[in-house]
């Protein structure tokens, strides 16, 4: 089975993703915002369609749009802290609506379904390198911010009083979530 290059590539990417996702996911669950993953994945759909529409790299488009949505979620969460579920629903609806509108326009340069429902078996060397770099950078960032992220996850106000740069770390974490999606 591992004598085929595509299986080796798929196995390597699966290992990288299986290292990255739990490291980020644990903080999402601790912050009681596990639905943010669903919102970010729908935001990536809109980013992919924007990338295809502008004839740029759809993966880059997905990252940029998802990072913007993550930053928007954090910005709105600061002002409407008790309404995270409402914020996530609004961003999710905005993202899915944007994706459907762009797909329905008929102006996409490629088939969006190829990117939506891809296969891990079709990963190439460029994808492997970018996923490995992303995993290493994200895990290192989480390692260095671990104590602050844990403090914020349990009591954001106490972390703020203790001198933790809560807003800055929340924005970094939003970008890490966007990159993982």
Model-derived segments and their meaning:
Residues 15, 19-23, 64-72, 98, ...:
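Generic alpha-helical transmembrane segments of integral inner-membrane proteins
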Residues 2-4, 120-123, 163:
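Helix-boundary and loop/linker segments of multi-pass membrane transporters
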Residues 127-181:
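Helix-loop-helix "hairpin" substructures at the membrane interface of multi-pass membrane proteins
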Residues 11-16, 59-64, 87-90, 128-133, ...:
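Hydrophobic alpha-helical transmembrane segments
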Residues 26-108:
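Short loop segments and helix-boundary regions at transmembrane helix junctions
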